[in-house]
């Protein structure tokens, strides 16, 4: 994902800016296409937040995983409200960044919410991340790491 987002800055739900390259290097990345006005997005986001917390905030060492929210909201204010209300402590592509539209086209996003799991190169591991989390919970992450070929010994 560094290949796609390298040189860009991402924003946290608290409004802090981070360099994408440093934040995403050697990680499995989940691109989360969603919007606060969308009931299925509002339904899935708390589950994704718990999944993220278990892998990143509570695990020692933290899992090589990061979520990048790609908003389909109608305004920057709507995006920030959705992030502050329901999102985990993950990252987001700024609302004004035109890459939001390019990513929707690149990953063929036609409905939301959609969770696309990608390798560091941006190559798709699965575009069924939402379903896999719902059906398999944390167990799906090990498969993603193996396919992504990052931190071979993470589960070691």
Name what the model sees in each region:
Residues 4-29, 54-57:
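A short beta-strand-turn-helix
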Residues 12-18, 22-23, 41, 63-64, ...:
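Plant-skewed but cross-kingdom recognition/interaction modules and surfaces
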Residues 15-18, 39, 52-56, 76-77, ...:
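Eukaryotic intrinsically disordered and solvent-exposed regulatory patches
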Residues 27, 33-53:
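Conserved redox-active cysteine motifs that mediate thiol-disulfide chemistry
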Residues 30-31, 67:
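Hydrophobic beta-strand anchors of alpha/beta hydrolase catalytic cores
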Residues 43-46, 80-84, 105-106, 129-131:
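Short coil/turn segments at secondary-structure boundaries
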Residues 60-78, 86-99:
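Thiol-based oxidoreductase modules, predominantly thioredoxin-like and allied folds used
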Residues 91, 95, 105-152:
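Non-catalytic, surface beta->alpha helical segment in thiol-disulfide oxidoreductase systems
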């Amino acid at each position: 994902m560094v290949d796609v987002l390298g040189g860009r800055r991402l924003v946290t739900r608290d409004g802090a800016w981070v360099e994408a390259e440093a934040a995403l290097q050697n990680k499995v990345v989940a691109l989360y296409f969603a919007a606060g006005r969308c009931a299925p997005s509002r339904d899935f986001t708390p589950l994704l937040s718990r999944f993220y917390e278990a892998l990143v905030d509570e695990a020692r060492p933290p899992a090589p995983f990061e979520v990048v929210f790609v908003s389909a909201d109608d305004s920057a204010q709507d995006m920030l409200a959705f992030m502050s209300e329901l999102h985990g402590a993950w990252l987001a592509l700024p609302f004004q960044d035109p890459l939001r539209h390019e990513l929707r086209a690149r990953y063929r996003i036609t409905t939301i919410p959609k969770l696309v799991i990608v390798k560091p190169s941006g190559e798709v591991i699965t575009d069924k991340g939402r379903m896999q989390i719902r059906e398999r919970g944390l167990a799906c992450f090990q498969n993603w790491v193996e396919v992504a070929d990052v931190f071979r010994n993470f589960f070691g």
